[in-house]
């Protein structure tokens, strides 16, 4: 749906309010109640025109600092919130190695460096999230059915209606406290599948300072990429 010249992806669900999101790629999404007709949706979005343009302007400003990484000696890559440099080596390694605060990659594997970095992040995230999930699921009284690390396009994580919880492999780039927030956020969706005040109250019970992590993602999320 195009409103005021902006192409907005409409997502209908069993919710009571209309929420607007600027996705990580700059596209605009609106999550709306299923019962609303198209004209009603258009009127609501038109009334939120200022908010939409304000959020788009903020996204543009934040993304001016986006980094395009090359797989060369000295290039930095994020891991758990810190940047570490890459060193290409002559010896044959199995994938990406991380040792002594340095990434190592065989020169012969440079042509598939992105693929190998993705595997590195997936493996590391898998090893990190399960103990954290175990801790917080008990505090929240929830039980996710299945945990997956995968490509999620414009989301850091997702909680499915069937109880599965998915995490983007890029979450391995975030600081550990931000990773804790992302996990708590998704587990709280097993209680409230929305972003009502009741949902945020659940998050706040576990992480009273979660606003700090939300702000970190807003400012630095653009750099969590390859």
Residue ranges and their predicted role:
Residues 1-180, 190-226:
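Active-site-proximal or metal-binding-adjacent scaffold patches in catalytic folds
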Residues 186:
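Walker B catalytic acidic pair
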